[in-house]
Amino acid sequence: MALPDRKPMLQVEGIKKYFPIEKGLFRRVVGQVKAVDDVELEVRQGETLGLVGESGCGKTTLGRCIVRAIEPTEGRILLRLDGDRMTDLLQLGKQDLRAQRRHMQMIFQDPYSSLDPRKTILDIVAQPLRANRMGSSSEIEDRVRDLVELVGLNVESLIRYPHAFSGGQRQRIGIARALATNPRIVIADEPVSALDVSVQAQILNLLQDLQAEFDLTMLFIAHDLSVVEHVSDRVAVMYVGKIVETAETEELYLHPLHPYTEALLSAVSVPDPDIGQDHMILPGEAANPADLPSGCYFHPRCRYAEDRCRTETPAWTEARPGHFARCHFAGELELTGVDA
């Protein structure tokens, strides 16, 4: 369920992340990899925004730019820290940024490499609390106990090390760590992609329960639209560094406006053997972010492409109420969706 009346918690404006291509002994810059290219996003308070796209489209890079794990090349990242005041995180110095990091936390993709194998679960979950001096030792330990129980683990787990836990249990520990500081926004970077399907469902249900209980604001990054469908209020689709479509979840699944979204939706399995599915196979590979095509980046793979798609860059258009797409023919093409 979308929350149109909520104030934005996060606004990403014109974010770019270009990596230089260097060549020769003197490392001369000969080009750029446009990993994130002029992205605009808004995540409202208490909302889960799903960010989807193929591997290599720039989703994770964008998430890391938002928390300033890597520095963007250009743009603004505005986070609501106090009342109605939005703070541009890119204008903060190192000391101020460190003080504000507790307001933005990440849940990482790999539950095996994201936990320090030399530390107990108590120390892992307590680390952000200690780093931000959020209480005495006893208060921090009490907080960690509450968090561990909240994510479905026993308090006896606190003295154990990560190797003693399964992948799903490790991801629960990662979630507890992310929630420790009561962040304003959580960036969940493919939090279930490394897990078995049955465990995925458990973690998704946990995230939904936590979001409902604590009114969490979350950017949920994934490559699987069937996963995003169950946790997101709205969905943004990313292709080669650009957002190509965004809408409320049900609206986007039923009425896609961009051919790339239609192709992604065709891969979503329908749990009914009587319903035939026409899986759309996109020709070729995704565009090279170091050598992007002219016009619409998607035109070499698009079955609907016309001459203008090869020469003109499509504008960001609101073709239906609250439903935006970057396509010359948004709202004109009859694209196939699925029931959300």
Predicted segments, located by residue:
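Conserved ABC ATPase "signature" region
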Residues: 84-88, 138-156, 265
